[in-house]
Design a protein with these regions (language model features):
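Conserved catalytic cores of phosphodiester-cleaving nucleases, focusing on short active-site segments
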Residues: 6-21, 35
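Mg2+/Mn2+-dependent nuclease catalytic core
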Residues: 21-38
Length: 69
């Protein structure tokens, strides 16, 4: 099953974040889509923004990110 890593409600949209370490933003986005995280928030009637972020533990920075609306 799994859970989305972070949810942010701006009042105008719901942002679903999946965070990865030393993988890829694409892997994070794939998890959001494969586990159908947006369906869990359908009753909010807010637009869903999916955000996948990959962190690099060597440089301690965001390596890449991907956003889908």
């Amino acid at each position: 099953n799994g859970r989305v890593d972070m949810v942010m409600n701006s009042g105008k949209a719901l942002c679903l974040f999946e965070l990865k370490l030393n993988k890829s933003a694409e892997a994070a986005m794939n998890q959001i889509n494969l586990k159908d995280y947006p369906a869990r928030f359908a009753l909010t009637n807010l637009p869903i923004i999916k955000i996948g972020i990959n962190f690099d533990t060597t440089t301690h920075t965001i390596e890449d990110w991907k956003i889908e609306r």
